Amino acid sequence: MEKDPKVAAQVKLILKLIKELSPGNTVELRIPGYGAIQCVAGGNHRRGTPPNTVEMSGPTLVKLISAPELWTELVASGLISASGIASDLSPVFTHAQALYEAN
């Protein structure tokens, strides 16, 4: 399956924004086929996969950055897999939305 270049470019930009807005290594944000970052300060995780993980598709990430209020709905529907006590990234996406729209 070939990646949509437009989605790939958007995912790259979104991951960069999230990493800049919320640096750290408490949560791993995974977008299979596109990339993954570690973000959110506060934990003392140092090696391997953090105990808090969030995974979604590229198109779901693009949808979420445009409508961060959909976080709960997307998690409930299974389009976002979020595990761990620090895995709620909805505040990060709310903050990132304005920066994303400015680009």
Placement of each model-derived feature along the sequence:
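Feature captures hydrophobic
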Residues: 1-103
